[in-house]
Swiss-Prot record:
It comes from Flavobacterium psychrophilum. GO terms for cellular component: membrane. The chain crosses the membrane at residues 15-35, 53-73, 83-103, 124-144, 153-173. The keyword Protein biosynthesis does not apply. Pfam families: MauE (PF07291). This is Protein TlpB. The keyword Iron does not apply. The gene is tlpB. It is found in: Membrane. Disruption phenotype: Cells show much lower levels of proteolytic activity than the wild-type, has a longer lag phase and a slightly lower growth rate and a decreased final density. It also shows attenuated virulence, deficiency in gliding motility and enhanced biofilm formation. Quantitative analysis of the thiol groups of periplasmic proteins shows that TlpB is required for the reduction of these groups.
Amino acid sequence: MEKVKSSYLPYTIRILISFLFIISAIAKMYPSPYFAISTFEVKQLYPLGFSEIIAPWFSRILIGIELALGILILQNNFLRKLIIPITILLLAVFVGHLSYVTFLSGGNTGNCGCFGELIPMTPIQAIIKNIIAIFLLVYLFFLLSKTNDKNNFYVVIGITLATIISLFLLAPIKKNTNDFTISPIENTLIDSTKNEIIAPILKDSVITTVKVDSVKKAIPTKIEEVISTTEPTKHKSGYAKLFPKIDTGRKTLCFFVPGCDHCRKAAKELTELKQKNANFPEILIIFMNEEVDLIPDFFKETGAEYPYKIIEIIPFWNALGTGKDTPGVKYIWNGNTYKYYNGITDNKFNPIDYQALINKPFSELKK
């Protein structure tokens, strides 16, 4: 019985740990390597203080090492001397980081990113998983005999370099840019009724008795007083580079991914609201540069086409905002943001709430 235990248990533990690390590495590249890794950088590394220059290198090397450890745990070269201790150390670092996140946020919400977007896991769940893995590795360390270790370091280096290089080939680092692509559909509708208040001009008696200069000075003052009570003062939203007229009037700004089912649902709900409301705020869309070939299908499912821009993945996440997720829907009035729906949980887009919001006068709105 003891012989069976000594022969099968170490291999069982090694297979489990290998599976854990390989799945973790692959999950961070799902559904497409560049998109998934860029998302991992923005959501997990940027909050830790990594710069836009360091994060792409660190993410690919880290995932490459994870994949390498998943493979190396199955072979015998420097297994007890090097591979197991490094694996334990890496897991301990993860536990330390996740414990800090848990201390700050409670740990019961959000996705720790251990398995990318494929298998969402809260920080507390990830801590438990990693502690169990550490105990298994410590047990494995004492189960294995020192004489079982082989000393071909070239195998270890070769596998590690191969996995890291493969990450850079699968998801090449792109030059950081904030440029955007102009959409082929740029059918921005222009209102026939412009936002101008024209002072009524009476007959000759007014023209002859009122000086022109006094009219020029008096009328704008009254107009400004009326506008100040009926709509907010203009501010810069930060999106004028994408949509030049976004800071004038009421707008619905959306952050969508063409292949995202939740984004399509939100867009469809917006279309239904717009069809029922002639004064609905103009809909503008910022698309992530991921699966852009699906944009025609996106609009077909939505039931309408809207002006849009396409921006690269990392600039898209930056524009969406730290801690925010798709779909994102903003209610903007004269450049002021009054509501920002995002994600698919508590703050997700709510068409009933949005309909009530856009019907409110300026005096009832809170930023």
